Amino acid sequence: MSHALRRAADRALVPIGYLLLAVAASWPLARDFATYTVGDVHYDERHAIWVLWYTAQAIAGHVSWPDTTHLLWPHGISVLVDGVGPLNGVLALPFWPWGAAAAFNGVALTGLALSGWCLYALARTVGVSRGPAFVAGALFLLWPIR
């Protein structure tokens, strides 16, 4: 195997590994991906789904961005200061064809996998070797509070 091919395989296997770990850690999210949302506080889930939907509508040009009077009418609010935020709205875009629950769960799963991968990248940047860096990312992904 050439050096470039091995390097490309290493770069692909790490995020795939974190994605598989995120699926295992969040089970049964993958099984119920388009039908149920994860979490215990249902009003938070509904609010988050609304922000994801509003971001998709803004990207499509159907609503104004970033201010809306749909919340806190008549004064409105900027969705940029919301905890869900526009980045999650962008990450949800590929999952919308499967419905609102899939968009919410897709963002949750993507965020979980990316948290491990980003800590891996940070550890590699500061000189930690691949194995311990992967373990550090896995521990961060599995940690209950981020």
Q: Across the structure, where does each feature detected by a protein language model lie?
A:
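Start-transfer (signal-anchor) and selected internal transmembrane alpha helices
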Residues: 1-29
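Membrane-interfacial loop-to-helix junctions in multi-pass inner-membrane proteins
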Residues: 4-10, 37-41, 124-131
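Membrane-interface starts of transmembrane alpha-helices
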Residues: 9-13, 95-107, 128-136
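Membrane-embedded helix bundles of polyisoprenyl
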Residues: 18, 24, 107-126, 130-146
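Membrane-interface coil-to-helix junctions
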Residues: 21-115, 143-144
